[in-house]
């Protein structure tokens, strides 16, 4: 964890303690955190409100059987924690390809923004028909649809995490 040029922590910093350390730093105005299942179950989120919550996966059975989480429905209850603290005027960004995640759309406050690779995904198509916001990949470019307009943002291959567009699971998330 770094703030400006100063390193605060080294190692696995995805838990609530790291979030608290960052938020308490006097130079921090905004931050992005990973709120994983383990940290949420052990100590909570590490923050009590947020402007944006992003939920990428539940239905793939990742981490089931750990920490007494046996079913996707139980994991839903853990992962919705971030959605529950979105402020009014904020947003919850949800993976349309995971039906359990997409089911979080009506929960809490803030706008639900759905994302998927396929612009023809039924939930993306519905969101676009309603003039709501959706994010998808079209012709190799990450695109945001809102209010009947499609705005190309960046070619997938230019996003470092996708390794030139060759890491499909990173593109999906």
Where are these regions (language model features)?
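Acidic, Mg2+-coordinating active-site environments of NTP-dependent enzymes
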Residues: 51-173
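Conserved nucleotide-sensing/catalytic segment adjacent to the nucleotide-binding pocket
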Residues: 6-47
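Short beta-strand-centered segment that lines the nucleotide-binding/catalytic pocket of NTP-utilizing
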Residues: 1-4
């Amino acid at each position: 964890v770094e703030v400006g040029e100063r390193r605060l922590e080294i190692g696995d910093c995805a838990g609530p303690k790291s979030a608290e350390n960052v938020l308490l730093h006097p130079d921090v105005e905004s931050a992005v955190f990973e709120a994983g299942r383990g940290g949420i179950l052990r100590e909570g989120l590490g923050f009590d409100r947020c402007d944006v919550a992003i939920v990428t996966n539940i239905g793939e059975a990742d981490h089931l059987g750990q920490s007494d989480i046996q079913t996707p429905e139980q994991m839903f209850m853990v992962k919705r924690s971030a959605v529950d603290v979105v402020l009014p005027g904020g947003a919850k960004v949800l993976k349309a390809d995971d039906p359990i995640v997409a089911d979080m759309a009506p929960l809490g406050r803030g706008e639900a923004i759905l994302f998927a690779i396929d612009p023809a995904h039924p939930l993306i198509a519905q969101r676009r028909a309603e003039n709501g916001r959706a994010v998808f990949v079209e012709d190799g470019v990450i695109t945001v649809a809102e209010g009947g307009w499609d705005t190309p943002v960046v070619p997938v291959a230019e996003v470092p995490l996708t390794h030139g567009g060759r890491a499909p699971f990173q593109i999906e998330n």
